[in-house]
Amino acid sequence: HANGDGGIEIVTQAYERLQQLHPRPNARHLVIHCQYPSYSQLQRLKAAGAYPCFFISPLCHWGEIHAGYVGADRVARFCPCHDADELGLPYNLHTDAPITPVDPLIQVCTAVTRTSRKGTVYGPDQAVTVMSALKAVTIHAAFLNFEEHVKGSLTPGKYADMVLLAENPLTVAPEHIKDIAVLRTYVGGDVVYSRS
């Protein structure tokens, strides 16, 4: 777990050193939260085979509070998903539940719009496409947990954990993504929740 650039620097140095002393291909070391990494830290994490797990939900819930503590300029780099995409560095989006609600659509919406609940936009240059954000809560999340062979996409032989949404997040207005209703949830192909 590392939030600020100082903590992320310590973790990055540790991963670099570990890979020098005990090289491990495909280690998939993680930096949980990873809220304020610099571009160069993301480059170094990639080189060390490490990945960010962005805790982006606070930007939606408490963007103004973060800006009050560290300034709007720094909040503009909060969970820089676009930089990670540009580097070809897979990442996931997580909620740190119960800190923020377990609602991947809020995470997707926040990564795409970079907008707080009060309507403030922070770091629009770090916004990503809807598809990129969806990958962060599906196939990339599975990959970072060494579960891409059983989760993260709908492929024969995988668990068939999925949701049926009332609307297509790829076609609705980006700010509406967080409001899309979940009609059904499937685990292992079985319905475990139905909105009916």
Regions found by a protein language model. Give the residues of each.
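His/Asp/Glu-enriched, well-ordered alpha-helical/loop segment
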Residues: G6-H29, H33, Y39, Q43, ...
